């Protein structure tokens, strides 16, 4: 199945059908498993709406909010707006390789590296078939600010209802039962990590 779908030639709906044959890592309520849930939800949106996830989100979220630079596959005339992606390697900081370049682990297994930005371009090698709900869209700080502003306004933007108030409330609630182990001071909402205790939540920083 793989772990990163944005550059795949296989559609998400096809992948989800294959996922359905796999055993569960845990059943609902047993444990927190960071996995493919958002990708599966994106495939469900496509199945129910009859649209690609990109078309559905553009019609219902991106365009109503005025998010003019948010895409699953960036048009060629805007390709230069993409940031160059770099990866930290044993030889220092290098431009991230393409999908087919891999790093071989000591045990002989191949681990896919960070992706370059080519997989987010319209008419890329993927054929623009895999609309990954979990990590497929790219945007700008300005566009994302419009989305966050809508959440802060309980689902409204300039007087227009984008999401229901209840949907926003559910997004930012911690849905993990207290007995399920997770990061100290944190919980998980609908697609977001939730800080439940500022005094416990923290980070040692990055290297």
Question: Where is each model-derived feature located?
Answer:
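Short, surface-exposed loop or secondary-structure junction motifs
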Residues: 1-202
């Amino acid at each position: 199945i793989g772990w990163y779908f944005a550059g795949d030639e296989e559609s998400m709906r096809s992948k989800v059908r294959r996922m359905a044959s796999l055993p569960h890592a845990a059943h609902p309520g047993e444990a927190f498993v960071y996995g493919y849930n958002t990708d599966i939800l994106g495939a469900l949106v496509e199945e129910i709406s009859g649209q690609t996830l990109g078309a559905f989100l553009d019609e219902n979220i991106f365009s109503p909010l005025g998010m003019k630079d948010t895409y699953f596959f960036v048009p060629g005339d805007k390709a230069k707006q993409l940031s160059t992606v770099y990866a930290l390697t044993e030889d220092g900081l290098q431009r991230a390789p393409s999908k087919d370049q891999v790093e071989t682990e000591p045990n002989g297994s191949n681990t896919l590296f960070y992706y370059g930005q080519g997989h987010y371009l319209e008419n890329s090698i993927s054929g623009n078939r895999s609309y990954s709900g979990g990590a497929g869209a790219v945007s700008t700080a300005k566009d994302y600010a419009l989305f966050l502003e809508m959440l802060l306004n309980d689902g409204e933007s300039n007087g227009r209802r984008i999401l229901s108030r209840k949907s926003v409330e559910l997004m930012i609630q911690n849905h993990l039962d207290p007995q399920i182990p997770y990061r100290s001071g944190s919980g998980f909402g609908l697609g977001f990590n939730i800080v439940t205790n500022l005094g416990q939540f923290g980070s040692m920083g990055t290297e």
